[in-house]
Swiss-Prot record:
Organism (species): Influenza A virus (strain A/Pintail/Alberta/119/1979 H4N6)
Protein name per UniProt: Polymerase acidic protein
Pfam families the UniProt entry points to: Flu_PA
Gene symbol of the encoding locus: PA
Residues the record lists as binding Mn(2+) 2: 80, 108
Bilayer-crossing regions: none
Amino acid sequence: MEDFVRQCFNPMIVELAEKAMKEYGEDPKIETNKFAAICTHLEVCFMYSDFHFIDERGESIIVESGDPNALLKHRFEIMEGRDRTMAWTVVNSICNTTGVEKPKFLPDLYDYKENRFIEIGVTRREVHIYYLEKANKIKSEKTHIHIFSFTGEEMATKADYTLDEESRARIKTRLFTIRQEMASRGLWDSFRQSERGEETIEERFEITGTMRRLADQSLPPNFSSIENFRAYVDGFEPNGCIEGKLSQMSKEVNARIEPFLKTTPRPLRLPDGPPCSQRSKFLLMDALKLSIEDPSHEGEGIPLYDAIKCMKTFFGWKEPNIIKPHEKGINPNYLLAWKQVLAELQDIENEEKIPKTKNMKKTSQLKWALGENMAPEKVDFEDCKDVSDLKQYDSDEPDTRSLASWIQSEFNKACELTDSSWIELDEIGEDVAPIEHIASMRRNYFTAEVSHCRATEYIMKGVYINTALLNASCAAMDDFQVIPMISKCRTKEGRRKTNLYGFIIKGRSHLRNDTDVVNFVSMEFSLTDPRLEPHKWEKYCVLEIGDMLLRTAIGQVSRPMFLYVRTNGTSKIKMKWGMEMRRCLLQSLQQIESMIEAESSVKEKDMTKEFFENKSETWPIGESPKGVEEGSIGKVCRTLLAKSVFNSLYASPQLEGFSAESRKLLLIVQALRDNLEPGTFDLGGLYEAIEECLINDPWVLLNASWFNSFLTHALK
């Protein structure tokens, strides 16, 4: 039978049938009759829809030889053969756009002419018996049923056969041929007898062999077999008294379930200590760009050429001097490193042909800044496993830090609009199916709201820096390569613009494992005076390197230009994630999409357009000490994006732990708000788990303070 199926049906149909069976844990090699039945059903569904179109006037027509220029729409949308999630998405989309009632079971087709879903049946028994089983199962007035048999009979709801005589005859002929082919090979009788009725009751799943033994071994105490455990679980009343249930399950558990009331939760305790400091891999709100508009110089697009061109736009360079030293570092080395960059860039310009990359001379200041020869010597484990007092270093607990106001300002800035666009609208082909049309519309609206957002600039900057650094780490492992920090954007007028934020010099990078570290020194331009918030710049040495003329309302003013220099490090895995920061756009789009879906399901139609275009409506953005902040839909998009971007920029184990543990408390509080009378045990343990993540990370501390604002307002 299996060979017959593979010869008799189109390979695409065979592949879809195999996939469907595997999804339900069935083997096409063993359940061959079922394999044949699924292929037959798929083929009938495809034949049902083949050649049927709707023309420009909305009339149903049959076109057999394809005229590629005709603007035709398929009359039938096929759900059968798609994977379940996709099929349901199509069904939901059709229901939203046409207003048709959503079916309980996944139908096979949708007819755009008659505006109804169709359930196709193919039976080896009497058509009317099978028709009744189908109707009984789906219990829906709205879904049209059409049954075919292998003997040429058919039956349809209200004797409305949907298709013309000829199209149906094609299907019946094909079924008759399949039957004859099977009969000639002696396969028909077994196939005919193997058809079971529509299963409307859940079957008991029999467990045998190893699985049975494992099931018996893994029962909770006091249960002798899987059957009596199953009976116990089936009789479990969900809203009964939990303590009793727990003690019934195991003698060891004695949890007192405490009711969780408005007065129960306390705010999270934020740590004390000096204010937290900036720890991102590059400057955010404090960054300054040297830019060129409409770049058309020779070698445009080669980072080094672009960087030199940007440097030439600034004329206010002066003798650099240290204005905010790094507490622990050898500050003159940072100063010398910057002077060396300037000198070596100058050297490049004096050469005939500018090289594509530039490796710095390995001077003592760079060796120091990049930690050259600082790594402890590695010893083979074989040589030291006999050492009696072998132990890991005692590492000190990190010092706690308190929340500082700068991180909230950073976040606010990330939500703002800039005057440039940082992402282009992707060119994606024409939409064909209704779901694609909705998806494109959402994507375009969302892109319009976030393309100018500063968080989007951070994404593109992060992608660029991480890509360049990973490339250089692999291509020039031993060299101290200079990597310009560049981004590209478009101005309001649509002119292209290339921006230089500063430079990175990378250290030796023999990265074997994902977590092996490459050190780098970053040097970034800024107009921010570090003496205003010295705690923010604890890890930096800041130089004053020039004076910049700025146009203001009162005319030109001269501002000192600073260079923020620090030693930093990253790893292959961190760079890999940094290169994929564009995912943040997707994550925040999906969050917005779930808001649209919620609106749409209430209104029972797609609400995308109204959602984005109703400018008067405000949406909750977040909690602050003042209460629930609200804003336009654009502001919501940008805030969600900024959160996602900061989760990437400030990724850390503290953030992972805080997000996972605080979510549990959040769910309990939400249950209380929804009057679900939640109960908890060991709430103290949960607080401990959350608070052990509040150490010194600025982004985690800010999220914890937001969480406290949420608690205050949620429990009023």
